[in-house]
Amino acid sequence: MFTILRKEELAQDTFLMEIEAPRLAQSALPGQFLIVKMTEKSERIPLTISDYNIERGTVVIVFKAIGRSTKKMSAYNAGDKFADVVGPLGRPSEFVHLSDEE
């Protein structure tokens, strides 16, 4: 089980959740995503990892409650648990360092 440590409503129907997931936080890189399952039988919801904190062992997701599953997920609060969070998935972003002249 993965505990929601913090939930904020950033704008109407747009939510931020900080989730306790130490192994995921240690492996996450910019540009990757994760998959949330609220219950064992619920839909798999892919979401971008918005932030991660290795020391705290947390990852942050931001989502808009527009479909049935994300609307249901928006009703979860700090202290509630997700059945499963899988990740990090996907290829990390590649950073290109350009000089100020380029």
What is each stretch, according to the model?
Residues 1-78:
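Ferredoxin-reductase
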